[in-house]
């Protein structure tokens, strides 16, 4: 078993690093700022990919792949875009032993290289919409990195769509941010707040950015997904026009949207504990571990354990047996708790005689007795569903407990380390920047979730907590990853 994990209350950041490495999810590489995603971590990403990919295809999207290298002239075509990304870019200046005629940027995001192609593919309204997604790696030269959360190279998906009208583009933006919200809540068991970013926080080159924000156990916010309305900015930069039904030549409307492997970091920080990883069953590659208690006639116990695993796998439950004799049952219990296996079955000679076994839940540690009969798969499925639901409800309860409405700047400063703060803002970049400078808190989201808007009166006018000027709405402030 791995070394002891630092307790969350002792050092939350160290707890996170210890857990990621001890559970063999990821490790540091010899390339500064880059990480190695180990098999346990990559298995989670594959589960995420499979679920998201199915959701993308169900909404009419198809996958493609575009080059890793982007000509410098492309990057410079969209002024806001290059201003936002230039400091983070890695640039290739030489190839084949010679200096390149034009520098190539290693993909920080793909809007420019994709829109250079869309210009060639789009002539008429009949060519629209284009609904393409790409699974890829990107590079952003980060100064301060943290496994999964912020690394120089990371994996993600990026959707890039082209539309005939502004209305269609906005519908796409909202469709995809709601796909992300559904994925976060139904698969990750992660409650999120959906809404719009401020002008200063939006994506470089976007007209507006929509996002989902989640609360981690240290009460900081984590941006879990974004969807951008790019307007006609990239179409104009690349002169991408089409002939409308009326025969007019018009610029195309665009969107882009993406999530990345930082979702694995969100998963860890939202649910895990001092014993290790806690995974929602829908994203667990291995859902059930069966541990034989090897006393007396061990062959009969092992045979029964393997039979149970085979039956569960046949019914769509990912089960496996650890019948190795190199480690004690207690060691195995701790090891699989560390790895986040949702359910543990303990099986000994007496259990076989009574046709029962003990099931332990990873989320609560609660144990129960299950019947070893034809209903076993149903019993396990009920447990898995209960764990999935409990993780969501637990995270939601935590967020609600640590979301506070404040009406003054002194109250704001006194509580900014305690979670999400709901407060009036005057809508100016200046006030937003001053609050960030003084408290390190940012406006995470202008919520659009009806329940939250109603609960906190988000759309009610008031007075800005910082400037004292009139405010048309409340927003959510927090410190963030």
UniProtKB/Swiss-Prot annotation:
It catalyses: tRNA(Pro) + L-proline + ATP = L-prolyl-tRNA(Pro) + AMP + diphosphate. The keyword Protein biosynthesis applies. It holds the Pfam family ProRS-C_1. SMART domains: ProRS-C_1. It is an enzyme of class 6 (ligase). It comes from the Bacteria. Belongs to the class-II aminoacyl-tRNA synthetase family. ProS type 3 subfamily. This is Proline--tRNA ligase. It comes from Prosthecochloris aestuarii (strain DSM 271 / SK 413). The gene is proS.
């Amino acid at each position: 078993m791995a070394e002891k994990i630092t307790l969350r209350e002792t050092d939350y950041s160290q707890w996170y690093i210890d857990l990621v490495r001890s559970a063999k999810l990821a490790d540091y590489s010899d390339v500064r700022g880059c990480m190695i995603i180990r098999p346990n971590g990559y298995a989670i990403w594959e589960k995420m990919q499979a679920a998201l990919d199915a959701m993308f295809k169900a909404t009419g999207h198809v996958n493609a792949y575009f080059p890793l290298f982007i000509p410098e002239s492309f990057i410079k075509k969209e002024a806001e875009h290059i201003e936002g990304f230039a400091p983070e870019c890695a640039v290739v200046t030489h190839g084949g032993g010679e200096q390149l005629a034009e520098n190539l940027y290693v993909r920080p995001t793909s809007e420019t290289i994709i829109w250079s192609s869309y210009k060639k593919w789009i002539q008429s309204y009949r060519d629209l919409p284009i609904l393409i997604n790409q699974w890829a790696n990107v590079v952003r030269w980060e100064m301060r990195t943290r496994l999964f959360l912020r690394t120089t190279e990371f994996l993600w998906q990026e959707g890039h769509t082209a539309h005939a009208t502004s209305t269609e583009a906005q519908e796409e933006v909202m469709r995809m941010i709601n796909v992300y919200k559904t994925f976060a809540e139904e698969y990750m068991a992660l409650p999120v707040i959906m809404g719009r970013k401020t002008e200063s926080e939006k994506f470089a080159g976007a007209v507006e950015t929509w996002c989902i924000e989640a609360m981690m156990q240290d009460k900081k916010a984590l941006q879990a997904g974004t969807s951008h309305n790019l307007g006609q900015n990239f179409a104009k930069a690349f002169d991408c026009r089409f002939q409308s039904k009326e025969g007019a030549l018009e610029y195309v409307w665009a969107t882009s949207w993406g999530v990345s492997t930082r979702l694995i970091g969100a998963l860890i920080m939202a649910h895990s504990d001092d014993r290790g990883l806690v995974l929602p069953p829908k994203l667990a590659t291995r859902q059930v571990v069966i541990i034989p208690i090897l006393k007396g006639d061990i062959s009969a116990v092992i045979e029964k354990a393997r039979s149970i695993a085979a039956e569960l796998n046949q019914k769509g439950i990912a089960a496996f047996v650890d019948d190795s004799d190199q480690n004690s049952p207690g060691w195995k219990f701790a090891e699989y708790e560390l790895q986040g296996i949702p359910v543990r079955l303990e099986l000994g000679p007496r259990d076989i005689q009574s046709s029962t076994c003990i099931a332990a839940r990873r989320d609560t540690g609660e144990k129960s007795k299950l019947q070893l009969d034809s209903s076993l798969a149903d019993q396990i499925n009920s447990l898995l569903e209960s764990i999935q639901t409990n993780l969501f409800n637990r995270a939601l309860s935590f967020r609600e407990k640590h979301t506070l409405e404040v009406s003054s700047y002194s109250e704001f400063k006194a509580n900014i380390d305690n979670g999400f703060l709901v407060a009036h803002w005057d809508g100016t970049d200046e006030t937003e920047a001053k609050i960030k400078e003084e408290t390190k808190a940012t406006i995470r989201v202008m919520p659009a979730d009806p329940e939250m808007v109603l609960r906190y009166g988000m759309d009610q006018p008031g007075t800005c907590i910082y400037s004292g000027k009139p405010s048309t709405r409340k927003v959510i402030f927090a410190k963030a990853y």
